[in-house]
Amino acid sequence: MLMLLVRGTRYENHRPKVTLPTPLGGRSNEATVCESPSPDTGIRWRRSDEALRVNVGGVRRLLSARALARFPGTRLGRLQAAASEEQARRLCDDYDAAAREFYFDRHPGFFLGLLHFYRTGHLHVLDELCVFAFGQEADYWGLGENALAACCRARYLERRVTRPRAWDEDSDTPSSVDPCPDEISDVQRELARYGAARCGRLRRRLWLTMENPGYSLPSKLFSCVSISVVLASIAAMCIHSLPEYQAREAAAAVAAVAAGRSAEGVRDDPVLRRLEYFCIAWFSFEVSSRLLLAPSTRNFFCHPLNLIDIVSVLPFYLTLLAGAALGDHGGTGGKEFGHLGKVVQVFRLMRIFRVLKLARHSTGLRSLGATLKHSYREVGILLLYLAVGVSVFSGVAYTAEKEEHVGFDTIPACWWWGTVSMTTVGYGDVVPVTVAGKLAASGCILGGILVVALPITIIFNKFSHFYRRQKALEAAVRNSNHQEFEDLLSSVDGVSEASLETSRETSQEGRSADLETQVPSEPPHSQMY
């Protein structure tokens, strides 16, 4: 016992050793609650039974000392038992000595749940916080998994274990279907590049007109024209393969070769040729315009949709170069024309990639591309399962059917049958006739159903996720907040990329300050917990 005499007044101080209960989810510890006078003032800085006034993210509450004493291992419990102001300041973010108020820059929603914990002794999971943010808040306030109520503990632990693996473990893509702020920030950074560019405002609006169909009425019209040209090009390619056009072009080619001229100039129907030239001119206009208006040339050539646009016009110009290299305009002989015809056929086959241009105007096609990009493991597993199954059942079918001469003559010849059987396609061009062969076919079909269904489910879930995410991003950037997007376009004139980052940080600080100023300095009714 310590006895002090201060100005005729005797103070007695006992230093009892108090063993704190085990912190919820933490290790047991011992602490000595010191009620000695403050070394600076000579008297205790707070009474032990004084209510604790706290301010958490703008939410002010009074907590009774008796409620905090029930949980001395928590942060507020240790703050209530702090022996000096210096010790208390280490437990909070700030302290107002005049108002005797402790400030914590933490989530106010979790603090309301924390108040319920001090009343009942049980903590409930908040749906507004993800499991990781909830765990960080609980650790900060000195709570653990044991503090969770029985109704929420199993759900919390399950979400905490499965959430990191509910998506791609090695992928940086967030599992939330809400549009990621980083994706919207990428658009903002791209727009900021026009601030220092020549004719930046005009280029920016033209670029948005070509890239965002929902930006304005001209952008919608441009998108409709682009889709129509793509469909017309695909239709012309399909019509060109009809027998009527093939016979007509073959007769014209024979007549041209007999006259010593190139057959390539007369093979195409005049109408289809003019339509092809118009489509090529439009595609070339699109590629060159996007290249000139792009905020970054380097990013332009890295974007998959831009590469598709380049591939859609590349065969036409390669055909012209091949014709010039092989003497397309001179009568040098039929052999060179034959080589040119083979080259042109290869280049014409590349025109089929024009159908991928529709991905620029289709959310589903873009979602499919993102799904395949993030599902290479599942696709690899699917191919591995199919390869193993085809190899096994092809060998069994060859052994059972090789004497029947029904198409199972060799094991490589059986691979085709095994592939169409495991994928449950079943063309019926090759079928087993023996009992053993039919049993092998039945096992192949059942095995294919099980093997294909496993990775396909994961791929389908990823496609659904990317589709919902893409729709949410489009709604956030173009539809639901169009006016704010227009304000952003006006604000980036003359703004560099660095200044945009600074303004974004300043706005975040301003929103935090606004949250604090919304709460009055003194609440009309103090609440005691």
From Swiss-Prot:
UniProt keyword terms in alphabetical order: Cell membrane, Ion channel, Ion transport, Membrane, Potassium, Potassium channel, Potassium transport, Transmembrane, Transmembrane helix, Transport, Voltage-gated channel
Membrane topology: Multi-pass membrane protein
InterPro entries: BTB/POZ_dom, Ion_trans_dom, K_chnl_volt-dep_Kv, K_chnl_volt-dep_Kv5/Kv9, SKP1/BTB/POZ_sf, T1-type_BTB, VG_K_chnl, Volt_channel_dom_sf
Annotated stretches, region: Disordered: 494-529
Transmembrane stretches, start-end: 218-239, 271-293, 305-322, 341-361, 377-398, 439-467
Gene Ontology BP annotations: action potential; potassium ion transport; protein homooligomerization; regulation of potassium ion transmembrane transport
Protein origin, superkingdom: Eukaryota
Extracellular side: 240-270, 323-340, 399-411, 432-438
Cytoplasmic side: 1-217, 294-304, 362-376, 468-529
Localization in the cell: Cell membrane
Keyword Cell membrane: yes
Pfam families according to UniProt: BTB_2, Ion_trans
GO MF entries: delayed rectifier potassium channel activity; potassium channel regulator activity
Ranges lying in the membrane without crossing it: 412-423, 424-431
GO cellular component, one term: plasma membrane
Keyword Hydrolase: no
Domain text: The transmembrane segment S4 functions as a voltage-sensor and is characterized by a series of positively charged amino acids at every third position. Channel opening and closing is effected by a conformation change that affects the position and orientation of the voltage-sensor paddle formed by S3 and S4 within the membrane. A transmembrane electric field that is positive inside would push the positively charged S4 segment outwards, thereby opening the pore, while a field that is negative inside would pull the S4 segment inwards and close the pore.
Complex and partners: Heterotetramer with KCNB1. Heterotetramer with KCNB2. Does not form homomultimers.
Protein family (similarity comment): Belongs to the potassium channel family. S (TC 1.A.1.2) subfamily. Kv9.1/KCNS1 sub-subfamily.
Name of protein: Delayed-rectifier potassium channel regulatory subunit KCNS1
UniProt source species: Aotus nancymaae
The gene coding this protein: KCNS1
